[in-house]
Amino acid sequence: MSGCDSICAATAPPHVRAIAPYQPGKPISELARELGLAEADIVKLASNENPLGPSPFALAAAQDALLDMALYPDGAGYALKAKLSARLGVDAAQIVLGNGSNDVLDMVARAYLAPGTSAVYAQYAFAVYPIATHTVGAHGIAVAARDFGHDLERMRAAIRDDTRVVWIANPNNPTGTFLPWNEIEAFLETVPPRVLVVLDEAYGEYLAPASRCDTAAWVVRFPNLLISRTFSKAYGLAGLRVGYGIGHADVVDLLNRVRHPFNVNASALAAAEAALDDDAFLARSYALNAAGMQQLLGGLAALDIETVPSKGNFVLARVGDAARINTELLKRGVIVRPVAAYGLPEFLRVSVGLAGQNARFLDALGEVLAAAPGRHPDSRKALP
């Protein structure tokens, strides 16, 4: 152990040392360096990014904001919150802005959790939920999944006297599962008022119109509800990092107390505000995803690969020896997401891309499977 390691081991709290760092999807530039590939020849379907990129409105606004980069941004995000307020039908005091929605989740942990408290989340929950929980020394309660998603009955039963937060994603990441809104509403009616329920809707824009719900209106009935949303997915602003939370004004006030100053940069604020004006781009993103999802599902079925029904912009596919198959895909310049860290070692998560990107992945996967047809028999198990 080096001197630095020894000092860190002696001074960092045990709950911090026990945290496994978040592993993002492999960047295109990293794979290019590792294998000597041209970046233009690499397809990345690993991080659920919008293959269309950002709205032209957002891009122009972000570029204009760069002219004032010597100045701090509006720390309160007045203009963006005003536009969100009008769009959502809530008061601006009910909105908190984050450096991506992950920042909002982190604020929740710092405002509501501490050693001696607990948070409840599903077995296959977004990795940031346990990370945020454990970072502040709280206890995480992982509840067994039902059909790869949330079992709300078990999650309600898991709430203890020391529970302060329940994390729910709808649709869920990394599995793509979806809970009917009436089930979530019924769950909220049973949760003790002292417990904050965080409803993560990062992928909400990919839901079919008939499956959408005005959950922002729920905060009047459920003051212990916080809704988390992002501009990183359907809006195509992942690189700028901007998200927001909607909740009771008292909850938002607490989050603002732990929010870092100037946590959303000027270009992100400007781009997000402009993106809200481009409904045509959002509709195009939805349509592209719907078509791409069908392309992926059809191609995977043709390869006899089972998938978990998904309402997001990605699909979870059981391929068997996922680690080996992922390595072979990388050699072919295709980046997808292994999910062994989520307890799903037989699966790969594949983001929906452009038609050509989806075809490139399916062709590469078919090539890999043909080269080693004896894949793990579990890859053929029926999924819900």
From Swiss-Prot:
Gene3D superfamilies: Aspartate Aminotransferase, domain 1, Type I PLP-dependent aspartate aminotransferase-like (Major domain). Its EC number is 2.6.1.9. Pathway: Amino-acid biosynthesis; L-histidine biosynthesis; L-histidine from 5-phospho-alpha-D-ribose 1-diphosphate: step 7/9. The modification N6-(pyridoxal phosphate)lysine is found at K233. It comes from the Bacteria. It catalyses: L-histidinol phosphate + 2-oxoglutarate = 3-(imidazol-4-yl)-2-oxopropyl phosphate + L-glutamate. One of its GO terms (molecular function) is pyridoxal phosphate binding. Its cofactor is pyridoxal 5'-phosphate. SUPFAM superfamilies: PLP-dependent transferases. InterPro entries: Aminotrans_II_pyridoxalP_BS, Aminotransferase_I/II_large, HisP_aminotrans, HistidinolP_aminotransfase, PyrdxlP-dep_Trfase, PyrdxlP-dep_Trfase_major, PyrdxlP-dep_Trfase_small. It is an enzyme of class 2 (transferase). Keywords: Amino-acid biosynthesis, Aminotransferase, Histidine biosynthesis, Pyridoxal phosphate, Transferase. GO terms for biological process: L-histidine biosynthetic process. Belongs to the class-II pyridoxal-phosphate-dependent aminotransferase family. Histidinol-phosphate aminotransferase subfamily. Homodimer. PANTHER family: HISTIDINOL-PHOSPHATE AMINOTRANSFERASE (PTHR43643:SF3), HISTIDINOL-PHOSPHATE AMINOTRANSFERASE 2 (PTHR43643). This is Histidinol-phosphate aminotransferase 1. It comes from Thiobacillus denitrificans (strain ATCC 25259 / T1). The gene is hisC1.
